[in-house]
Every structure is written in C-alpha cells, then in structure tokens.
C-alpha cells in the first residue's frame, strides 16, 4: 500500500499536508474562455470552457527531466491551448521530484503532464507534440508505450467521471460495449480487452521500442524492483560467473538533491573502482549501457546481513549461550569495521549509508560492505544525511566522514543491545541501551574483561560523532539513564503510571497542533481511522486497559474524550471502505462493544454484518473474512443477536471452512513469504495474515459448536502454517 506521510515533524508521523510546499510552482498562462482548477495539491487542470470531452480514450502522458521541466510545460501548454485540448500538470517541483523518486509506484511514476484529446484529435495533437518535444528527455512511463522519439507516451484509460446522462461507473472503470472493465494502472503497457484502436495506432502498436546491443549476462531472478530499476541475481554469459546486477533507468530515482538513479549507480561504480583491491568490497565484472538503461554487474558477496547474524547469535538466554563467545565475536566485527572505515576514508571515499543491511558476515565472522550508491568523494563541506535506515540517520548537518562514523557507532551499539531505531527520535538513545546491554551480559556470566573491552569500543565510536545541544524548536529529547529493576508489584504500578503520564503528555502535545484525529499513530494508520490496529478508538481502548492495572490514576477529561472518540467512529462508520478486524468496520464494532456501548455495537453489527462480510476481499484475520467471522462468533457467544442473524453467520462460517479445506492455498500463502515487511498489506504469514489466524477462527468455532468440520479445519490450518517454519537448532 502507498502511504501518504510526512517526516518533517520532530515527534509525530503526519499526513503530507502537514508541511507547506514552498518549492517552485509550475505555472502556465490561462487563455480567454479557459478554466483552471486544482482539485488536490498535486495536479493543476486546465480545460476549454464549453468543450465536450469524451469519458475515456487514449491519454497522452508526457515525462520530463527535472532541469528542463518548466520549458517543456510551456511548449506543451501552447499546443494544447491552440488545439483546445484539456490537460493537467504537476503543481510544484517537490511534487515532480516525488513522482520521479525511487520508491514511487512504478504504475504512476514519470507522469508530468497528461493531455485528454478526443479520438478525432489524437493523431494531429501527437504529431504536433512530437515535433515540438524532440529535443527533450524524460523517464520511460512503464504503464504506457512510447509514441516516437520525444518523451510522449500513450495508454487507454478514463478521462473524467461519468455525467448524469451516462452510465454510472466508478472513476477507475471503463465502459467497453456493454461491459464494465477495470482501468488498471500497472507498470506494464496493456490495452483493455475489447478496445479497438484507431487505424493509425495499429502500426505504432506493432512497432518495437528501439533496443541496442545484446545482454552479456543471463538474469536468473529479481531480488527487488523499484521505480529506478531492478536488482537481479545474474550470470555472465562469457564464463557463467555469478553476479549481482544493478539496473538504473534514465531520469528516475530523482532525489531532492537533484540526482538521478543513474548518477547514484555511477557513484557506486566509481567507489568500487577506487576500492578494487579490497577483498571486503565487491569487484566490478561488467558496467555499461544497454538500450537506455545503465547496468552494473558486481561480485556476489558471500554472507548474511549483519541484522540476521545478530538474530542468529544474540544471547538472550543462558541456556543457549554456553560458549560465552558473543562479545569476542562482536569485538572482532567492530574492530574490522573501524579499520575498514579508516581505510576507505584514506582513499577519500565516504559510504553515507552504513547500516546493518549493508554489512555482510560470512564464515569466521569475516565482513564485507556493500551498496555504495550514496558514496561521495569529498569531505570538505557539511551535508544533511538524506538517505538512512531507521535508527541510523546522523543528526544535523555534519561532515560525510562523521556520517559514516555515526553509522558504525549505531551498528556497534546494536550488536551490544539490538534496540537503536528510537535513535531517530531521542538523541543519544544508545546511551540507554548500553546500560541495559551491560546488565544483560553481566547476568549471563560474561567476564568483566570482555564487557569492558566492548564498552571501550563503544566509547571510542561515541567520541567519533559530534555532540549537539539543540535540534529543533524543541529541546533535544534526552534518553533515560535510570536503571530500572522490576522487583515488586509497586514497581510495576510505578512503571505503568509513568507510561500513562507519557500518554497524556503526548496526547496534549498532539492536540495542540492537530485536529484530524485524537491521537498520533504510526504512518500505516494515518489514512484510516477504523479497526483495532491504528484507530483512535483502539488507542484509547489500549490506554483504558493499561489504566485498569493501577489504582486511582486520573486522566482529565477521559470520559468526555471517550464519548467524542466513539461518536466520531460511529459518524464516520459508513465512510470507511475497509471491513476488517484490524483496519475496518468490524473491528470498530467490537471496540464499541468493549467500551460498554452494547446497544450501539449490537445495532451496528446487526445492520451491517452481511454487507461487511460480502464486501471483504481478503480471507485473513487482519483485514479479511476470518476476522469478521471471529467477531461474529464473539457476538453469538454473548447472546446479543437474534437467531436469524446467528444462522446467517454460521452459514457463512461453514461455507468459508469448506472452501478452506478444499483449497487452503487460495486463502493464504503456504510456505515462507516472498517479502519480509512490517507493512500489514505486504505480509502473508503468521497469526494476523496467514493460516494461524484462520486456525484461531476454526478453534473458536469448534469450541462454540463442537462440530468436527471446524476441528478438521483447525488441524489443516496449523499444518499449512507450519510449512513456513524451521526448527531452531538452539
């Protein structure tokens, strides 16, 4: 899922509308009898007053490189004005950069201007645009096919919403004959089934894009894709040598510093050439251009990412830490990282993106450093650390060398106690994790000598990073240095009270600045406010559960806030398009019931259950039918619904179970997930997203009904879940 979020606030995730876009605007003159409108902050529309525009047709998309974008817009606008062709363009340079960034959806990227000609105008406007724009460059728009030499692209799609006298369909649906077809925006050119192109387009459709040269490598599989291109496992044709192949599409991956992915790939190539004699950095086996894309083929370095090495080796428990060698191994790795950093700095190479994923560990704890695309080659001026993994972003403007040392410092602290992500919010947070790390290793029986040596390495790396006093309009948040040991019930009470006070302080700070919702939330939840994962209702319920653990804790205005939050959830109930337990309507109903608003919850459930279930597209616990049915069973067990609705729930439950038993693979992925992500819409395994959640549903169904079909479903779901698991050798 694409998330609209902003990182400029010092404490909270916010929507993109939090900050004012002060970048340069794209503007064109408005002729007489034309109208201009800005329906959102991304696009500016211009159209001739009184002209009929077809509902759908061949869209003309135009891309541009950043430096010539204003001039290109003027040339396109002149033609559209003269030919009375409606068009839209991006509103500001910041929007342009985001549309061409590395992480933007490949189905949307690159589109700077869209023209909406009626079909009888299409050929002539294409000819004029091609003649006027030949001298310009721009990224290839993956959802379209290029018209000729200029950065002009076409795809068939929706132009505008349906009018009152037309067939009513959604804005993302096409009318093809008597059928309604989805207007898919995919990163591949595709003509919707049933669309007959005009004659002059058929020759164009048969024409292949010009490609030059033969691939000197064989691609085995893709590691990942981005708007900038792919990263692949590949082999050289010449000798079969395994390589990592990196691809850069031209004029993509644009950053706010004005550099493209091809320039970043060139930086990586330059860095690796300078460091070519090292065994700890990849060798270059092939570099060049094929068609319009740049490729870099580098050595396939052995080893596992350092974060995975920590997962496999960190000694949380005495029973799995018999050798007591973890700190010795950490010392060895950190010493090597310090030595390597000094060596590449002596060559005037500065990595700028050092984090756990870019350090590989192989046998005998030998290490290598990969992903040099952010590398710079001067240490003369202070810069802002723009690209960084969570917990590894250096604070304030600083020298490139100090950015690298900050990364090494954070890595070392992570090896000692793997909790550094909060460093982006709390300055010097690792001073706190260091205390806890020392306590842990003392409790596990590590020697004073080993602990002190690692501590000395941490102190050395701390000294390599500049100290700061202030970071924003707020004083720097300090880390907590007090050592806390939970030894009694009163200690637990005191700790909970501190958490609750922190909650109330955070709530107060948030409400001073924002009215869009009651509580701050992770950016995964910014765009919806229903369900038990990220809604205001869920956050307040969690607070309430915590407050029940202590005596006489008072939150001013709690009952007033509770009433407002519940009313807000009910008032916005129908606006939500999501149905699930964690992200949608059924979760909201359950929360309202748990708050004691039983009549309101039962009314919502009785009125909307069938609709919620039928509209759900997923099968899992988090956002799909398993979670919806689980809440249905909950209400059945409470005796809160009539027999007719109860029968409807059980009918759907039985049908769901039979379908699962027949073909569980269509419900959830069987085996390990292809993607490792915290994003709830990219995850396909475990309790919330996989067969374990389905098993929970069947277990509750068996407890309630005693019917063997649910026991059979439970056993099958557990078996399917366990396919993805491995036995821990420890």
Q: Which functions belong to the PLM regions below?
A:
Residues 2-23, 166-221:
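Juxta-kinase regulatory segment immediately upstream of eukaryotic protein kinase catalytic domains
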Residues 24-45, 50-52, 195-238:
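ATP-binding glycine-rich phosphate-binding loop
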Residues 55-66, 218-269:
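ATP-binding glycine-rich loop module of kinase domains
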Residues 283-294:
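Short beta-strand micro-motifs within the conserved protein kinase catalytic domain, predominantly
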Residues 341-361:
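Catalytic-loop of the protein kinase fold
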């Amino acid at each position: 899922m694409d998330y609209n979020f902003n990182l400029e606030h010092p404490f909270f995730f916010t929507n993109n509308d939090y900050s004012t876009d002060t970048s340069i605007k794209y503007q064109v003159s408005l002729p007489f009898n034309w109208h201009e409108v800005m329906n959102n902050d991304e696009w500016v529309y211009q159209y001739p007053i009184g002209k009929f525009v077809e509902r759908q047709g061949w869209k003309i998309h135009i891309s541009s490189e950043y430096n010539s974008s204003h001039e290109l817009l003027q040339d396109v606008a002149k033609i559209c004005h003269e030919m009375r062709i409606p068009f839209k363009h991006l509103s500001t340079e910041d929007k342009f950069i985001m549309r061409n960034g590395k992480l933007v959806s490949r189905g949307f990227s690159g589109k700077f201007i869209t023209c909406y000609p009626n079909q009888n105008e299409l050929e002539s406007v294409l000819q004029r645009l091609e003649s006027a724009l030949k001298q310009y460059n721009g990224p290839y728009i993956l959802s379209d096919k290029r018209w000729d030499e200029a950065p002009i692209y076409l795809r068939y799609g929706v132009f505008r919403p349906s009018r009152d006298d037309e067939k009513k369909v959604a804005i993302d649906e096409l009318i093809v004959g008597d059928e309604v077809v989805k207007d898919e925006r995919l990163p591949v050119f595709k003509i919707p089934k049933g669309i007959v192109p005009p004659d002059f387009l058929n020759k164009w459709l048969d024409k292949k894009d010009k490609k030059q040269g033969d691939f000197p490598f064989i691609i085995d599989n893709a590691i990942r894709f981005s708007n900038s291109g792919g990263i692949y496992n590949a082999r050289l044709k010449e000798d079969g040598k395994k390589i990592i192949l990196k691809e850069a599409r031209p004029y993509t991956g644009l950053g706010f510093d004005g550099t493209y992915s091809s320039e970043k790939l060139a930086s990586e190539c330059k860095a690796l050439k300078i460091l070519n004699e090292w065994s700890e950095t990849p060798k270059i086996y092939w570099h060049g251009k094929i068609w319009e894309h740049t490729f870099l083929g580098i050595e396939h370095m052995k080893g596992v990412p350092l974060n995975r090495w920590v997962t496999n080796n960190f000694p949380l428990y005495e029973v799995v830490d018999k050798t007591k060698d973890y700190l010795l191994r950490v010392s060895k790795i950190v010493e090597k990282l310090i030595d390597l950093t000094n060596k590449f700095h002596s060559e005037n190479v500065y990595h700028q993106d050092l984090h756990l994923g870019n350090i590989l560990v192989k046998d005998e704890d030998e290490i290598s450093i990969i992903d040099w695309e952010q590398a710079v080659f001067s240490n003369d001026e202070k810069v802002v650390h723009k690209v960084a993994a969570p917990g590894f972003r250096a604070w304030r403007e600083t020298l490139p060398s100090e950015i690298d040392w900050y990364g090494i410092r954070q890595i070392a602290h992570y090896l000692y106690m793997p909790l550094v992500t909060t460093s982006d919010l709390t300055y010097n947070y690792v001073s706190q994790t260091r205390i806890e790390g020392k306590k842990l290793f003392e409790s596990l029986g590590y020697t004073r000598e080993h602990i002190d040596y690692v501590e000395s390495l941490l102190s050395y790396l701390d000294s390599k990073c500049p100290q700061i006093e202030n970071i924003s309009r707020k004083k720097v948040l300090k880390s907590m240095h007090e050592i806390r040991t939970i030894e009694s019930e009163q200690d637990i009470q005191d700790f909970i009270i501190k958490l609750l006070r922190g909650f109330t302080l955070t709530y107060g700070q948030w409400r001073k600045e924002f009215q869009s919702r009651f509580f701050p939330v992770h950016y995964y939840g910014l765009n919806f406010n229903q369900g038990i994962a990220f809604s205001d209702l869920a956050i307040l319920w969690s607070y309430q559960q915590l407050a029940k653990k202590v005596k006489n804790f008072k939150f001013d205005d709690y009952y007033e806030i509770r009433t407002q939050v519940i009313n807000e959830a009910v008032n916005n109930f129908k606006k939500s398009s999501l149905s699930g337990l964690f992200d949608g309507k059924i979760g909201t109903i359950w929360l309202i019931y748990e708050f004691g608003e039983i009549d309101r919850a039962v009314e919502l459930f009785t009125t909307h259950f069938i609709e919620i279930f039928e509209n759900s597209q997923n099968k899992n616990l988090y956002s799909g039918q398993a979670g919806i049915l689980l809440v249905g069973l909950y209400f059945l067990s409470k005796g809160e619904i009539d027999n007719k609705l109860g029968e409807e729930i059980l009918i759907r439950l039985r049908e769901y179970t039979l379908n699962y038993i027949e073909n569980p693979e269509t419900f959830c992925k069987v085996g390990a997930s292809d993607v490792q992500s915290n994003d709830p819409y990219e995850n396909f395994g475990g309790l919330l997203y996989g067969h374990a959640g389905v098993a929970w549903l069947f277990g509750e169904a068996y407890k309630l009904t005693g019917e063997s079909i649910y026991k059979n479903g439970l056993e099958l779901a557990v078996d399917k879940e366990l396919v993805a698991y491995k036995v821990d050798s420890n």
